[in-house]
């Protein structure tokens, strides 16, 4: 059975952040199946439960919705507009379990990798 979870993503090591940055990332409330994979059917059933919070330097810089778009793409929409603020890179294939890495692509095409810092059922 799919449950909703709070998933914390923190910026992983990259140029300019050789140790990563736990104060830069996303808090996501998302439906995960028993294997830790995103469940699009569960999100379509309860879309109001899919939330995203973007933080930088520990401060909230945006909040919005987790959505599944055309072709199954996972979208982080921080301003409730039509355009994605970030797209999950192959999120449908990823497992959201602590210690795993996932990538997000910004509208500019810039891509960043995040570590799944924690996953807690809500």
Where are each of the predicted segments found?
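Intrinsically disordered, low-complexity boundary segments flanking structured domains
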Residues: 12-18, 52-53, 61-63, 102
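A short, compositionally biased
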Residues: 3-5, 69-72, 96-100
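Short beta-strand micro-motifs in enzyme catalytic cores
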Residues: 5-7, 74, 112
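N-terminal intrinsically disordered, low-complexity, charge/repeat-rich segments that act as generic
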Residues: 1-44, 56
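Short, compact, well-ordered microdomains
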Residues: 77-122
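Well-ordered beta-strand positions in beta-sheet-rich domains
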Residues: 25-29, 63, 88, 113
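Residues in well-ordered beta-strands of folded domains
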Residues: 10, 29, 67, 77, ...
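Short beta-strand/loop turn elements enriched in aromatics
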Residues: 47-87
